[in-house]
Amino acid sequence: MSQVILDLQLACEDNSGLPEESQFQTWLNAVIPQFQEESEVTIRVVDTAESHSLNLIYRGKDKPTNVLSFPFEVPPGMEMSLLGDLVICRQVVEKEAQEQGKPLEAHWAHMVVHGSLHLLGYDHIEDDEAEEMEALETEIMLALGYEDPYIAEKE
C-alpha cells in the first residue's frame, strides 16, 4: 500500500485557523501515491517574511509567493523515500482565495496539489507542460470534491 509520511511544520506567528494536519495528509494522499510507492514530504506553513526571503534567495523574486517546492535529489545509488519540501505562505494563500473568490479550504488544497506535482517533476514553464500540469491538478481537485481551480481562466 502506498504511504505518504507528512512532516507538518507550522511556523506562523498565529497558527489558528490553519487547515488540520489530517487535511494536509488527505491532499497529499490524493496526489503522490499515484506516482510513487512510499514518500516523505515536509509542508512548512510560513508568514510573508519567510516566504519573501526564500522566494528572493531561490527564485530571484522580491516578494512572497503562495507555494515554493524544493524537491529532494537523491544521490545516485541511494534509495530514499524523501520527496521534498513545500513552503506555503499563509497570508498569500488567504489573500489569493479572497481575490479569486475561491473557498479558502479549496485554495489550500490546490496549493498542496500544485506544489506536490512540482515535487514529482511537473512544471508549467512551457505551454504544453502547463496544460498537462493544470489538467492533472483539475482532475485531482475534482476527485477531492473541489471545483476546477482554473475554471475562471477557462470562461
Swiss-Prot record:
Source taxon at top rank: Bacteria
Residues involved in Zn(2+) binding: 114, 118, 124
Cofactor: binding comment: Binds 1 zinc ion.
Q: Which PANTHER family match?
A: ENDORIBONUCLEASE YBEY, CHLOROPLASTIC (PTHR46986:SF1)
Provide the cofactor list for this protein: Zn(2+)
Q: Which family does it belong to?
A: Belongs to the endoribonuclease YbeY family.
Enzyme class, spelled out: hydrolase
> What's this chain's function?
Single strand-specific metallo-endoribonuclease involved in late-stage 70S ribosome quality control and in maturation of the 3' terminus of the 16S rRNA.
Q: What is this protein called?
A: Endoribonuclease YbeY
MF terms in GO: metalloendopeptidase activity; RNA endonuclease activity; zinc ion binding
Record-linked Pfam families: YbeY
- GO BP terms: rRNA processing
Q: Which Gene3D superfamilies match?
A: Metalloproteases ('zincins'), catalytic domain
Spell out the InterPro entries in the cross-references. MetalPrtase_cat_dom_sf_prd, YbeY, YbeY_CS
Give the record's keywords alphabetically.
Cytoplasm, Endonuclease, Hydrolase, Metal-binding, Nuclease, Ribosome biogenesis, rRNA processing, Zinc
| Name of the gene | ybeY
Instruction: State the compartments where it is located.
Output: Cytoplasm
GO CC annotation: cytoplasm
Query: Which HAMAP family does the record associate with it?
Result: Endoribonucl_YbeY (MF_00009)
> Which EC numbers characterise this protein's activity in its record?
3.1.-.-
